[in-house]
């Protein structure tokens, strides 16, 4: 394989940058661009050691000073020789060091190529490689715990145990079908049925956790809706922890959609603070209302905000009916709880089981909003030591495996021939092997690693 290199840290001004080189000649390439002060040569350095020194160009002129770390094959991330050069984190100097590595024979790595080599060299399974990417992108504790479990091989072992069991069963079924005259032990249909039921239960758990996992991993598209001047922007600022939306006593201040992400417990709310939804003759405001309605149609969660100190009017009820027809998950927020409550709760409880009182101005009611949101979305109560949130590719394989294994169980219960059962189990086992990456096509592997950043 060719020698590859890339910047493994974000390309931005910072304390340090790391340039990674991997391949058979990685250490000799490192030796040409780095001159250690503490030893004679990089090529004499043992694995898992580092040295301070000078980064130099082909003429021996100093470019920067830094630290070089050596990892020797096969005890490295990729399974190949690796050199990592840590230099100062300026954009120009980082690019300069990368160019020096390319001048000495390394090629610029593709997206995810280091982790892909780890997979191809048997250092990681495909699911573990996906766990690496999920660790990088995790935005909360549940997502990070799941990513770590996947990265350490928990999902691979769970699915691999299933597939191995069915491969053994397939071998027994094939022998029994192909050599009926031989004195072979009879296949226990009860044991086979039990194996299928156990596998289906395991797959059902993975599939059932998927929707919640996607919410925790990717966040929730959330629209804050309501009439003008009910406190939508104040609520958004409260959730963000800083002033993002302009807040005034003038109705209709927000005319465009303001979008930001906020953390609410373990959830990431992708917030859209919309223009107040009401009838207006103002052309600009009217356009803002239309945009707000489009946002509502695409939202997963709608937080409808009402002023607790003002009785509900026709426009309020029209908004409630409009969102109800969209079939969205709704939390109704009665804002300004520090003022006198004149709203009849019963009018609102027809539209949502989650009606809460808050004072966004005083930052009161955040916990109640969090509890309502988690309950409405079915989030919470996960065991951090065992819950794995599979990704879309893995779920597609799990659902396909489940379909075939369920058909095998149904065939068994209906008294069909073991030939028919064998075909279904074989298809199910193949789907499980694709999930773990043991039988994934080159196109699937390429697709997985194309989602990585360059340098990982």
Predicted regions and their residues:
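C-terminal-of-GTPase-core extension/linker across diverse P-loop GTPases
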Residues: 2-7, 11, 141-263, 280-282, ...
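Generic enzyme active-site microenvironment
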Residues: 271, 305, 333
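Switch I (G2) and immediately adjacent beta-strands of P-loop GTPase domains
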Residues: 51-64, 68-72, 252-280, 298
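A glycine-rich (often HGG/GG-containing) alpha/beta subdomain
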Residues: 1-145, 149, 153, 326, ...
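Short, Asp-centered acidic motifs that coordinate Mg2+ and/or phosphate
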Residues: 269, 301, 331
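Short glycine-/small-residue-rich Rossmann-like dinucleotide-binding loops
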Residues: 240, 275-276, 300, 307, ...
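Inter-motif core of Ras-like GTPase G domains
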Residues: 285-309
């Amino acid at each position: 394989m060719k020698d590859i290199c890339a910047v493994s840290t974000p390309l931005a001004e910072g304390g340090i940058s790391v340039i990674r080189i991997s391949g058979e000649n990685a250490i000799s390439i490192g030796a040409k661009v780095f001159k250690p002060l503490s030893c004679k040569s990089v090529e004499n350095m043992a694995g898992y050691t580092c040295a301070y020194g000078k980064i130099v160009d082909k003429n021996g002129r100093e470019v920067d000073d830094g630290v070089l770390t050596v990892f020797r094959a096969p005890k490295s991330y990729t399974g190949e020789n690796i050199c990592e050069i840590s230099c100062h984190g300026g954009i120009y100097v980082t690019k300069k060091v990368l160019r020096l590595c390319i001048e000495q024979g390394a090629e610029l790595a593709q997206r995810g190529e280091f982790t892909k080599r780890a997979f191809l060299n048997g250092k990681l399974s495909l699911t573990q490689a996906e766990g690496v990417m999920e660790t990088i992108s995790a935005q909360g504790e549940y997502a990070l715990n799941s990513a770590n479990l996947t990265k350490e091989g928990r999902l691979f072992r769970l699915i691999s145990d299933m597939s191995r069991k069915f491969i053994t069963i397939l071998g027994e079924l094939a022998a029994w079908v192909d050599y009926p005259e031989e004195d072979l032990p009879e296949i226990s249909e009860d044991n086979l049925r039990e194996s299928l039921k156990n596998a289906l239960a395991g797959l059902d758990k993975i599939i059932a956790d998927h929707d919640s996992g996607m919410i925790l991993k990717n966040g929730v598209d959330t629209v804050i809706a309501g009439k003008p001047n009910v406190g939508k922007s104040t609520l958004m600022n409260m959730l963000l922890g800083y002033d993002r939306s302009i807040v005034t006593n003038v109705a209709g201040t927000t005319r465009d959609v303001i979008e930001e992400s906020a953390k609410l417990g373990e959830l990431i709310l992708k917030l859209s603070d919309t223009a107040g939804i009401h009838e207006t003759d103002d052309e600009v405001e009217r356009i803002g209302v239309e945009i707000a309605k489009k946002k509502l149609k695409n939202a997963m969660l709608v937080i409808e905000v009402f002023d607790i100190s003002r009785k509900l009017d026709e426009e309020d009820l029209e908004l409630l009916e409009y969102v109800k027809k969209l079939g969205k998950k709704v939390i109704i927020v009665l804002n300004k709880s520090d003022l006198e409550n004149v709203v009849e709760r019963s009018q609102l409880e027809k539209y949502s089981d989650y009606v809460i009182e808050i004072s966004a101005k005083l930052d009161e009611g955040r916990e109640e909003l969090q509890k309502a949101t988690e309950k409405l979305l079915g989030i919470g109560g996960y065991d951090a030591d065992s819950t794995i949130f599979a990704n879309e590719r893995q779920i597609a394989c799990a659902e396909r495996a489940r379909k075939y294994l369920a058909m095998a169980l149904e065939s068994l219960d209906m008294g069909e021939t073991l030939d028919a059962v064998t075909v279904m189990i074989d298809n199910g086992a193949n789907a499980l092997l694709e999930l773990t990456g043991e039988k994934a096509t080159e196109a699937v592997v390429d697709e997985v690693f194309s989602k990585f950043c360059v340098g990982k």
